Design a protein with these regions (language model features):
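Short, flexible turn/loop "capping" segments at secondary-structure junctions
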Residues: 89-90, 122, 179-181, 238-243
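Short, solvent-exposed polar/charged micro-motifs at secondary-structure junctions
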Residues: 17-19, 171-176, 219-224
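Short, well-ordered beta-strand elements within core beta-sheets of diverse protein domains
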Residues: 128-137, 184-192, 247-251
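A common structural junction motif
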Residues: 116-117, 204-214, 265-269
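PLP-dependent enzyme catalytic core of the Aspartate aminotransferase-like
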Residues: 2-5, 23, 195, 202, ...
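Positively charged, small/polar-rich N-terminal and surface patches that mediate targeting and assembly
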Residues: 161, 214, 220-221
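Conserved PLP-enzyme active-site core in the AAT-like
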Residues: 1-158, 163
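Conserved small-domain helix->loop->beta segment predominantly found in fold-type I
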Residues: 147-211, 233-237
Length: 269
C-alpha cells in the first residue's frame, strides 16, 4: 500500500473530471483513445482542468502513437507509451517510455530511474531504435487499413457496432479529428447478440489470436475472456465491454487480404 488514492471518472466528460477534483488531487491520468472501446478524451480540456487545480495531466498515448497524437502540444505534462506496441511495431521487444517537457519533472523521473534501475537493455534499445525509422510508414498504413475496415464493417449485417474514432457521426469523431493526425490502427467490433466470438476469431487465418497490439501483423482478441477477463462481469458490462466485443489491432498487410479474412470469418457464423 503506497497510500495512493484515486477516483475513476469518464475523462471524456470534462465536467466529471472537474467534479472529481479534490484538495489533494495531484494528477489527472487518462488514456486516449481508450482500451478497448476507443473513447476519445479532449486532452486540452482535461489538462486545463488539471492545471486549474495545480495538478499535472498525464496521458497514456499508446493506442495513438506519437505519430498520430502529440499530447505535450495539447497541454499534457507527461506522456506515457508502451514501446512494445507501435513504437516497437514488430512484436519482438518489451519496453515503455515516459516523456515530459517539464525539466523539474524530468529530473525527478530520472532520479527514480537511476535509483530503481528500470532501464532498457542494449538489445531492447536497439530494437526500438530500428523500429522508429519506419514508424511513420507503418502508422500511415495502420491508419489507412483500419479506417477502410471500420467503414466496411460498420455496414455489415452481423456487426452490431464498430468502435473507431475515425467514423464520422460518432461521439468521438470531432475531437479525434481535431487532436489526431490519423485515427490509428485499433478498433473494436461488437458482434450481433448470440453470435459466437470464439468461433469467429478461431476461423480467421490472417488475423492472429493474441492480446498484444501495434505490430505489423494483424491481431484479434476477445476482451471478455482475454485482456479484461479479470474484471467482474457485472462491472465489465457496466462499462460497455460486452461478451460479443472483439478487439482488433489492424496490421499493415494487404487490405484485400484483411477484408477477405474477416468476411469469411463472419460468413461462417
Amino acid at each position: 500500500d503506497l497510500g495512493v488514492t484515486y477516483t475513476a471518472v469518464d475523462t471524456a466528460d470534462s465536467a466529471a473530471i472537474e467534479a472529481a477534483m479534490q484538495d489533494n488531487t495531484k494528477m489527472v491520468y487518462l488514456e486516449t483513445p481508450s482500451n478497448p472501446l476507443l473513447h476519445v478524451t479532449d486532452i486540452e480540456q482535461a489538462a486545463s482542468v488539471a492545471h486549474a487545480h495545480d495538478a499535472i495531466a498525464v496521458v497514456d498515448n499508446t493506442f495513438a502513437s506519437p505519430y498520430n497524437q502529440t499530447p505535450l502540444d495539447l497541454g499534457a505534462d507527461v506522456v506515457l507509451a508502451s514501446g512494445t506496441k507501435y513504437l516497437g511495431g514488430h512484436s519482438d521487444t518489451v519496453s515503455g517510455f515516459v516523456v515530459t517537457s517539464d525539466e523539474t519533472l524530468a529530473d525527478q523521473i530520472k532520479m527514480i530511474q537511476l535509483s530503481v534501475g528500470a532501464v532498457l537493455s542494449p538489445q531492447e534499445s536497439f530494437l526500438v531504435q530500428r523500429s522508429l525509422k519506419t514508424l511513420a510508414l507503418r502508422v500511415e498504413r495502420h491508419n489507412e487499413n483500419a479506417l477502410a475496415l471500420a467503414t466496411w464493417l460498420n455496414d455489415h449485417e452481423k456487426i452490431q457496432k464498430v468502435y473507431y474514432p475515425g467514423l464520422p457521426g460518432t461521439p468521438d469523431y470531432e475531437i479525434a479529428k481535431r487532436q489526431m493526425r490519423g485515427f490509428g490502427g485499433m478498433m473494436s467490433i461488437e458482434l450481433q447478440e448470440g453470435l459466437d466470438t470464439k468461433q469467429f476469431v478461431e476461423n480467421l487465418n490472417v488475423f492472429q489470436l493474441a492480446e498484444s497490439l501495434g505490430g505489423v501483423e494483424s491481431l484479434i482478441e476477445v476482451p471478455a475472456v482475454m485482456t479484461h477477463a479479470s474484471i467482474p462481469r457485472e462491472i465489465r458490462l457496466e462499462n460497455g465491454i460486452k461478451d460479443e466485443l472483439v478487439r482488433v489491432s489492424v496490421g499493415v498487410e494487404n487490405l484485400a487480404d484483411l477484408k477477405d479474412d474477416l468476411a469469411q470469418g463472419l460468413d461462417a457464423l
